Amino acid sequence: MASFKIVIVCLALLVAVASARRRDMMSDDELDYHYSKRGIPCACDSDGPDIRSASLSGIVWMGSCPSGWKKCKSYYSIVADCCNQ
């Protein structure tokens, strides 16, 4: 009887996994919009030395900059980079 229950549970899981819908892929424009809204603004080297009057044109990315973005801060950090497009 216990093996019958195990078979039923396994079949139910198989049906649930097989019928799961895949999420639609985002277009490049949607990805750019979401990338630009992600993260914390940071000051690039081109924004000037004064952080209070800087326009904060960069965005902090954990790890490294994604494709299409470039590192805009001169110092090196293992944890995060200040990137802009």
Swiss-Prot record:
Gene3D superfamilies on file: Anthopleurin-A
Any one GO CC term of the record: extracellular region
InterPro entries: Myo_ane_neurotoxin_sf
Disulphide bonds in the chain: C42-C82, C44-C72, C65-C83
Residue span(s) of the pro-peptide: 21-36
Signal peptide coordinates: 1-20
SUPFAM superfamilies: Defensin-like
Tissue and organ distribution: Expressed in ectodermal glands and in clumps outside of the extodermal layer. Is not expressed in nematocytes. In adult female tissues, shows similar expression levels in mesenteries (gametes-producing tissue), tentacles, pharynx and physa.
Homology family: Belongs to the sea anemone sodium channel inhibitory toxin family. Type II subfamily.
Record-given protein name: N.vectensis toxin 1 4
